[in-house]
């Protein structure tokens, strides 16, 4: 059975390293499903979840919240380089919910004061918090 090696790396180090039969990511151009022997590719990732079906248990799926980044697929090795990434089991949902509330308040304040850059940063923070909540709830 063909397999791929999946590695997710952040500035803090290696977050994820397993063999996979299937990987799904969301790029800026849309969803990308990856099977072994996939064509070599480099793409920019959205803030979204990464789905990994491991080879050791075809019913088990690992979920990782990735905050953007780049994916490289080459010779059955998938490398994701992201600013931050958290496995489903490592996500503190209550902390993510607090971050979501904080981001919503910051969006409202920035909008009222017409602070475009601050509002944009708060929207990205909100998107990241929602992504963490979604992955942590799986």
UniProtKB/Swiss-Prot annotation:
<keyword id="KW-0139">CF(1)</keyword>
<keyword id="KW-1003">Cell membrane</keyword>
<keyword id="KW-0375">Hydrogen ion transport</keyword>
<dbReference type="Pfam" id="PF02823">
    <property type="entry name" value="ATP-synt_DE_N"/>
</dbReference>
<dbReference type="InterPro" id="IPR036771">
    <property type="entry name" value="ATPsynth_dsu/esu_N"/>
</dbReference>
<protein>
    <recommendedName>
        <fullName>ATP synthase epsilon chain</fullName>
    </recommendedName>
</protein>
<dbReference type="GO" id="GO:0045259">
    <property type="term" value="C:proton-transporting ATP synthase complex"/>
</dbReference>
<comment type="function">
    <text>Produces ATP from ADP in the presence of a proton gradient across the membrane.</text>
</comment>
<comment type="subunit">
    <text>F-type ATPases have 2 components, CF(1) - the catalytic core - and CF(0) - the membrane proton channel. CF(1) has five subunits: alpha(3), beta(3), gamma(1), delta(1), epsilon(1). CF(0) has three main subunits: a, b and c.</text>
</comment>
<dbReference type="GO" id="GO:0046933">
    <property type="term" value="F:proton-transporting ATP synthase activity, rotational mechanism"/>
</dbReference>
<dbReference type="GO" id="GO:0005886">
    <property type="term" value="C:plasma membrane"/>
</dbReference>
<dbReference type="InterPro" id="IPR020547">
    <property type="entry name" value="ATP_synth_F1_esu_C"/>
</dbReference>
<keyword id="KW-0472">Membrane</keyword>
<dbReference type="GO" id="GO:0005524">
    <property type="term" value="F:ATP binding"/>
</dbReference>
<comment type="similarity">
    <text>Belongs to the ATPase epsilon chain family.</text>
</comment>
<dbReference type="Pfam" id="PF00401">
    <property type="entry name" value="ATP-synt_DE"/>
</dbReference>
<keyword id="KW-0406">Ion transport</keyword>
<keyword id="KW-0813">Transport</keyword>
<dbReference type="InterPro" id="IPR001469">
    <property type="entry name" value="ATP_synth_F1_dsu/esu"/>
</dbReference>
<dbReference type="InterPro" id="IPR020546">
    <property type="entry name" value="ATP_synth_F1_dsu/esu_N"/>
</dbReference>
<keyword id="KW-0066">ATP synthesis</keyword>
């Amino acid at each position: 059975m063909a397999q791929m090696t999946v590695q997710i790396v952040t500035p803090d180090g290696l977050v994820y390293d397993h063999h996979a039969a299937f990987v799904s990511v969301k790029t800026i151009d849309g969803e990308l499903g990856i099977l072994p022997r996939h064509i070599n590719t480099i793409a920019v990732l959205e803030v979204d979840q990464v789905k990994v079906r491991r080879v050791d248990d075809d019913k088990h799926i690992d979920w990782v919240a990735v905050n953007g980044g780049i994916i490289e697929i080459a010779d059955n090795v998938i490398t994701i380089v992201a600013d931050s990434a958290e496995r489903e089991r490592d996500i503190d949902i209550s902390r993510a919910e607090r971050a979501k509330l904080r981001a919503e308040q910051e969006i409202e304040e920035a909008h009222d004061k017409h602070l475009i850059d601050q509002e944009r940063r708060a929207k990205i923070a909100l998107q990241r918090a929602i992504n963490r909540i979604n992955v942590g709830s799986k």
